[in-house]
Amino acid sequence: MTIQITIIKIEGYGPWTLKLGSDREAQLQIFQASFYSDLQNLFTKRNCILYFNRFDELIAISNGLSIDDHLFIEQEINDMYKGIEISMAIGTGETPLDANIAAHNSRKNNILVSKSKLVYASEQIQLMYNNSTKSPMDMFAQVFHIDIDNSTKVSNMLSPYEITARIMEMFSKIIEMFIEQKSMTFFLGGDNFMVISNTVSKEKVSEIINKIQDSQNIKLNCGIGRAATGRKAVQAATEALDTIRSLRDKGILQPVYEIEWH
């Protein structure tokens, strides 16, 4: 079973920002928010999900998103935002990190798809979609939705900025521990994190969560979602997290819960 990852990058972003002059920071913040919103909308309409890596680079779980779909999104964004171009590198692998590396290598080795100067994919991926109009059957995504258990208690003890400092410290720890499992972690804002984690078992995530809790002295919950596409896996993970909260309200403590959608 494999996962497909797409790396989306704004080309020439640094030089482009300099053209806006020294009073550009507010303009850039507005642009980044608008760009993310439009790109997320284009991907989620196709059952994918998008995460910030850097503000000029984003990463999507793109299971089943064909080469033609990528080309359509590229054209839509280029039409919306005159003066900038985006590139997309597509990769597959047994783990999210492997798929990410495959995507990176397709770009590094300049393996362009036909009809585009900025969409990259291995010959294997191009053949996979050229020979079928259906989504590949062996793709799936597993996502962990992690949050702080009863974060209101923490917010009552610390100021907002101090809370952010603690959360960033925790984010660093979560990234470190999950990249060892060839998984990819993203901060969603608030006290929420998501981990793309195809090959990590429920037992292993419980072990990792316990280690993080012991080092940070904060309780965590983790909803596990599995589905064929990124968007559905995220929905399942969030439903699992909601179930943990519902069980907690009934006096049942189950910090890790999993839901799989077929």
Each PLM stretch: what is its role?
Residues 1-262:
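Regulatory and interdomain segments flanking nucleotide-handling catalytic cores
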